[in-house]
Structure formats: C-alpha cells, structure tokens
Amino acid sequence: METPLKPLQLSLELRGITKKFPGIVANDSVDFDLSEGEIHTILGENGAGKSTLMSMIAGLFPADEGEMRVFGEKVNFTNPRQAIEKSIGMVFQHFMLVKNHTVAENIILGQPGVVRLNLKEVHQQIREISERY
C-alpha cells in the first residue's frame, strides 16, 4: 500500500503584491507560492519587474499593496535584516563586496546577530557551510 504524500508547507506566499514607481507599475498584483524544497526561476525581459519583486521579498523596499507570508506568518519587511531573520536573503548578480574585508568577513556580514567578528569562529562556520553544499 502506498503512503500518501505529505503536502509541502508553503515557505513563501505572495498575494496581490504591487509596486509602483513614478510613471511605472513594476509589479501588478503578483501572486506566488513557494513550498519547502521547491526551486523556481523568475524569467522576464529587462524591466519586467523581476529584481523589484525579489527586492521586496528580501526587504530592500516595501510593496505598495498586497500581503507576504513566510511559513504562514504575515510579514512586512522594512529592511533586509528583518528578511534575513526569517531566513530570506538575496545573492546579487553583481556582488556587493567590501573591498577591505576578507572573503570570510564578507560572507559573515549578512548574518543575523553579528556585532563583532571572531574570525576563528567565522572560518569554522564557513568550512561547515561549504561542506554541506
């Protein structure tokens, strides 16, 4: 007898997400669901609103309308730190690195709760993360 598949938990839900800039509607009532373990690609022409959508999800700026939920909890990110605390981050096409920092320091900069760097711990964390992936 086959065991029924357990429904995947929704990690991210977007409902009616809209973002407008002067003279432009970048995103118009976007609905999107992402379940645990899924991988999606957002495709579109230049200026289609892909980066705008991802920037709202990552907390870089708020939506003008709509609702976003992370694991069922309604969220209104006002900055990237809030998104990171919910395990949402964004890797930019063009890396924004701090030139005077080491690789380890650049990697750890976006981590929640980091006030002072213990480089020995940072190097260990990076080793552990790189072994997982």
Language model regions located:
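Glycine-rich phosphate-binding loops of nucleotide-dependent enzymes
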Residues: 1-133
